[in-house]
A protein has these predicted regions:
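A short beta-strand element within beta-rich, extracytoplasmic domains
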Residues: 185-187, 191-207, 637-641
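Long, low-complexity serine/threonine/glycine- and acidic-rich segments characteristic of extracellular
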Residues: 35-93, 97-101, 109, 621-708
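Active-site-adjacent "subsite" loops/lids of carbohydrate-active enzymes
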Residues: 278-305, 347-379, 389-441, 559-563
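Active-site neighborhood of glycoside hydrolase catalytic domains
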Residues: 426-541
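Catalytic domains of carbohydrate-active enzymes, especially glycoside hydrolases
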Residues: 306-337, 441-442, 513-516, 571-575
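Aromatic-lined carbohydrate-binding/catalytic grooves of carbohydrate-active enzymes
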Residues: 320-368, 515-523, 527, 531
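Substrate-binding cleft of secreted/luminal carbohydrate-active enzymes
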Residues: 322, 326, 515-526, 552-615
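Glycan-recognition and processing domains
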Residues: 126-190
Length: 708
């Protein structure tokens, strides 16, 4: 039995050996006692698992996390004769006064409770240099705290003496709830630290809090997915920084805020170098990130121009070089200061959020009422070292909705379904006028996005003709500026709906596109064959930036996402286009760090070298992607799979005990990415059994799923 203390998390990895004759499944019980006292109690542990498995781990009540951290109990599969590990968080119970000195026990049992082996070791650590913030009465604004405040009081509450079952570190928390149209007052926790620290945050499961340091330009939303889970926010120098606490916003207004504790771990030069070293290497790949101010503003109250800089700071931190900022979709109201198209000023709607099928908000209209979106995005992107492109969705008029634009209302005969028809000369002239407008505002580059709505194009030559007109406009402006105006095109890859109408080879040959971004639409065709596109741009000035989808139906980060990136880099692409990048960069902090890897092929390769080395050490497990915002798996989604602890080999899928699909290797998913698999999960409840080859046997796990 051996152990090591992680210098960043200050948690222990404890390793032990499972007896060679152990059955397929064994129960592991972990406990700790103050050194030499024999006062055993459950240890707060989780299995040693990959970041991808941790991401896909089901939340309560389906998940196992609560059992792990409250009972110290977990299951290991097909582990006979192998060394397995648990990660033990000693805080706070086993870390009095910042020091750990305890006995740690691992007991291995059969499922029936027969003890197969018991291992013990002593754990010691001096963590007195770690700073824990959880006495929230110390904030600089005591007037903003109250005991049992009403919502309309707009006060925070520092709650203490909460029951042990609440799973809060010291039985205390900071909690606040304000009226939906007004925020809670910000709180400041004073600090006087020097040097680099790693900062972790712990909240109640599925609660959130807004945090920033006093030197930051933006607030990050953070929250634990599981009880007692510490989330790595960031690492940075803490000289002259205080911590600022805010409640977050949603499309419906301001939400509640909850915080258990914040942990700050000092970092040695060696540890800091290791953390930063994962991003090292030549920046040999271009990273383009799609940013949709509409979606960002859906959950923000944007009333000041400077607010537009806040999300772009995160994009720059993520290493994005080309910012593709959407201004609107042709035929709909636009999200910028247009005097040609009608702006979106009022109430609008969005994609489903949780159980709300059609969420509405006034926030996006508010952004248009008080700010100039296009000018702000262009200006701040350039200030932050990015190359901005003004992006338009090729067309979706959203007929009979608040988003429908004037051109659609006045000329329904120019539509095909919900899209404008590119074969209509007046439509092309209208579209070109909007591009001329954003170029006059100052866009250094422009882009057009035919995904998710390619129906506006009737045939390839229609689009080729339009792109020649667009190229002529861009070149005219470029000559006047003395600098070329690049054109970026996102379009359906082979197999995607209407892909045959997009003649990318002609675009490259005639110089109509500077960036070629073949793409999936929704959950299908994420792993399209890149070879024809590599061949098309060979010897040209056009850069190939295939799309890797950043939305929930795309490959999950980090593992499946970086698997596709590595595959594309090996094929010789010039870089990656992430749609929607804001879903990753402005969401989870760990995703923003994954994005930082993309600009360096060597950084991505190094990530895989490390993952391949750790894979045999992980606890064996099979993990599936959850539903999206709507319950059940829909035809436009795919159930995707990740495995830990075994080599990536054959996998079989049994739906209600019938073999329905087999993969010889990754990418793992139920069915194919073609339309033929849209109905592979029929409507209603099902039992899904997945078998993954593990040496000379099979690792099996069963899941209860629903088809939408």
């Amino acid at each position: 039995m051996r152990s090591e203390l992680d210098p960043v998390t200050r948690q222990f990895r404890v390793s032990y050996t499972v007896p060679a004759g152990a059955p397929e499944a064994v129960t592991i019980r972990c406990s700790w006692s103050p050194a030499g006292q024999g006062q055993w109690r459950p240890a707060k542990v989780i299995p040693f698992m990959s970041d991808t498995a941790l991401r896909l781990l089901p939340e309560e009540p389906e998940g196992f996390w609560r059992q792990w951290v409250t009972e110290g109990k977990l299951t290991e599969l097909r582990a006979a004769g192998l060394e397995r590990s648990v990660v033990f968080n000693p805080y706070p119970e086993a870390q009095p006064d910042g020091r750990v000195d305890c006995d740690f026990r691992v007991q291995i049992e059969t499922p029936a409770g027969e003890v197969l082996a018991t291992h013990e070791t002593r754990l010691q650590a001096d963590n007195t240099d770690v700073v824990y913030l959880e006495d929230w009465s110390r904030v600089l604004q005591p007037q903003s705290l109250a005991e049992k405040p009403a919502r309309e009081d707009r006060k925070w509450e520092y709650r203490t003496g909460l029951p042990e079952g609440e799973l809060l570190s010291l039985g205390s928390e900071l909690y606040g709830l304000s009226p939906s149209d007004l925020p809670l007052p910000g709180l400041t926790y004073p600090l006087d630290l020097r040097g680099p620290y790693a900062i972790f945050v712990c909240t109640r499961a599925r609660h959130g809090i807004g945090l920033r340091l006093t030197g930051d330009e933006r607030t990050d939303g953070l929250g634990s997915r599981h009880p007692t889970q510490e989330m790595l926010w960031r690492w940075c120098r803490m000289d002259r920084q205080h911590l600022v606490i805010e409640n977050l916003q949603s499309y419906a207004g301001y939400s509640n805020g909850q915080l258990d504790y914040v942990k700050l771990v000092p970092l040695s030069d060696e540890t800091l170098q290791a953390l930063e070293g994962q991003f090292a290497g030549p920046r040999d790949k271009l990273v383009a990130g799609y940013f949709e101010p509409y979606s960002w503003a859906f959950s923000e109250r944007v009333t000041e121009t400077l607010q537009h800089r806040e999300p772009l700071v995160a994009f720059a931190e993520a290493g994005v070089q080309i910012l593709d900022a959407q201004m609107g979709r042709f035929g709909a109201r636009v999200n910028y200061e247009s005097r040609i198209a009608d702006q979106l000023w009022g109430t609008t709607f969005g994609d489903p959020i949780g159980h709300v099928e059609r969420p509405t908000t006034d926030n996006v209209g508010m952004m248009q009422q008080f700010t100039n979106t296009c000018d702000a995005e262009l200006r701040y992107a350039r200030e932050l070292g990015m190359m901005p492109h003004a992006n338009f969705g090729a067309t979706n008029c959203y007929p009979n909705s608040p988003l429908e634009g004037r051109i659609s209302r006045e000329h329904p005969e120019w539509r095909r379904g919900s899209t404008l028809r590119y074969e209509v000369p007046e439509v092309r002239a209208y579209i070109l006028s909007l591009y001329r407008e954003v170029l006059e505002i100052g866009a250094p580059g422009i882009s057009i996005d035919f995904c998710r709505y390619p129906e506006g194009v009737d045939q390839a030559e229609t689009l080729n003709g339009f792109l020649r007109e667009l190229r002529q406009l861009a070149d005219e402006v470029g000559r006047n500026r003395g600098q070329k105006v690049p054109i970026l095109i996102r379009f359906p890859a082979k197999g995607v709906r209407l892909w045959e109408r997009f003649d990318y080879a002609t675009w490259v040959r005639e110089g109509l596109a500077d960036y070629l971004c073949p793409s999936n639409i929704q959950g299908r065709h994420h792993h399209f064959d890149i070879a024809p596109y590599v061949e098309a741009v060979r010897g040209s000035q056009c850069k190939l930036l295939p799309v890797v989808d950043g939305l929930h139906w795309g490959p999950e980060m980090p593992g499946p996402f970086l698997w596709r990136v590595q595959q594309l880099y090996k094929a010789g692409v010039d870089g990656i286009y992430v749609y929607q990048a804001d879903a990753r960069i402005l969401g989870r902090m760990e995703d923003r760090r994954v994005m930082r890897l993309l600009g360096s092929s060597s950084a991505v390769a190094r990530w895989w070298e490390r993952e391949d080395a750790l894979r045999p050490q992980y606890s064996k497990g099979i993990y599936i992607t959850p539903y999206g915002e709507e319950p059940g798996y829909h035809g436009w989604q795919r159930l995707r799979v990740w495995t830990d602890g075994i080599e990536m080999g054959p996998m079989e899928f049994y739906l209600d005990d019938k073999l329905v699909h087999r993969c010889e290797g990754p990418p793992y998913l139920l069915g194919t990415e073609e339309y033929e698999s849209d109905s592979i999960i029929p409507t209603g409840p099902h039992t899904l059994r997945i078998r993954a080859q593990d040496g000379d046997g099979w690792l099996e796990q069963t899941f209860q799923i629903n088809g939408a």
